[in-house]
């Protein structure tokens, strides 16, 4: 395991060299376990809206809820770079609101923030960066904007979409992002963006050519109700949890638990 706290500079140094690895985390125990691994970054993602809180999309999660989960992750003191997702309407209304909310995340222990959007978000990104807060960009399939782009689909098929994605990436880099998430685009498009930018790119569902990868922890652990085609379950914890719960129920009902080592009695 690598030693020391991962920094923005560490991310930048990995560009074109060693792949960056990121996962989401939303609570203390998960972040604590991750802190003992070689993982580079933790995203406290707005995906918690769906995988933790049970909402149907990412639009429902609030700043208050995001801050509660960020606090939980930060208390674990992970060595990884901690990135906080800015939820829907926490940065789109005005640049001043965006800076204020980004500042709240940093005050609560985030090392940086992530926000969705392309060139239309450049001024917002620029002002957050000028306030001294590192920003991770996010283009491609941006879940907070799924209504506008016509649902969840792979982007970059047409020449127009490809050119827009490239323009988004370049404008965001000029605005000061330190890295860029590319989600659910065609792999060759993500490759072109990666080759074009000086900052590292991190893919989710956009192929192997980026400078790094990020996945939702529930997908990796086999806990999701539905696993996206671009994800991979490295263990089936859902099945293991079911087995453990059923074993507990069985032992309690058959008076096999608790045993002597599980309780104390007064000596007569």
Curated annotation (Swiss-Prot):
| Cofactor binding notes | Binds 1 Mg(2+) ion per subunit.
Q: Highest taxon of the source?
A: Archaea
Q: Where in the cell is it found?
A: Cytoplasm
Please give the pathway this protein is involved in.
Cofactor biosynthesis; coenzyme A biosynthesis
User: What is the catalytic activity of this protein?
Assistant: 3-methyl-2-oxobutanoate + (6R)-5,10-methylene-5,6,7,8-tetrahydrofolate + H2O = 2-dehydropantoate + (6S)-5,6,7,8-tetrahydrofolate
Instruction: State where 3-methyl-2-oxobutanoate binds.
Output: 46-47, 85, 114
Where Mg(2+) binds, per the record, is at 46, 85, 116
Q: Which UniProt keywords apply?
A: Coenzyme A biosynthesis, Cytoplasm, Magnesium, Metal-binding, Transferase
Complexes and interactors: Homodecamer; pentamer of dimers.
Family matches, as PANTHER family: 3-METHYL-2-OXOBUTANOATE HYDROXYMETHYLTRANSFERASE
**Can you tell me which family this protein belongs to?**
Belongs to the PanB family.
| Annotated protein name in UniProt | 3-methyl-2-oxobutanoate hydroxymethyltransferase
Q: Which gene is this protein's source?
A: panB
């Amino acid at each position: 395991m690598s030693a020391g706290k991962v920094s923005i500079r560490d991310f930048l140094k990995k560009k074109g060299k060693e792949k960056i690895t990121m996962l989401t985390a939303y609570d203390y125990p998960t972040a604590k376990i991750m802190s003992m691994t070689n993982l580079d970054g933790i995203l406290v993602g707005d995906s918690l809206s769906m995988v933790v809180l049970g909402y149907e999309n990412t639009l429902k999660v609030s700043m208050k809820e995001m801050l509660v989960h960020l606090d939980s992750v930060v208390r674990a003191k992970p060595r990884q770079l901690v990135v906080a997702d800015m939820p829907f309407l926490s940065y789109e209304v005005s640049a001043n609101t965006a800076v204020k909310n980004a500042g709240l995340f940093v005050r609560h222990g985030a090392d940086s923030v992530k926000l969705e959007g392309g060139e239309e978000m450049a001024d917002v990104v620029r002002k957050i960066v000028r306030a001294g807060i590192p920003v991770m960009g996010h283009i491609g399939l941006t879940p907070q904007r799924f209504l506008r782009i016509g649902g969840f689909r792979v982007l970059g098929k047409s020449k127009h979409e490809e050119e827009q994605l490239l323009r988004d990436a370049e404008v965001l880099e000029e605005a000061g992002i330190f890295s860029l998430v590319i989600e659910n685009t065609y792999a060759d498009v993500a490759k072109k963006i990666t080759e074009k930018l000086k900052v590292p790119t991190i893919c989710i569902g956009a192929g192997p050519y980026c400078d790094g990868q990020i996945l939702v922890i529930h997908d990796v652990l086999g806990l999701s109700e539905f696993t996206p085609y671009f994800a991979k379950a490295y263990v089936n914890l859902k099945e293991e949890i079911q087995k453990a719960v059923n074993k507990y129920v069985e032992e309690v009902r058959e008076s096999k638990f608790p045993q002597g080592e599980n309780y104390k009695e007064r000596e007569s």
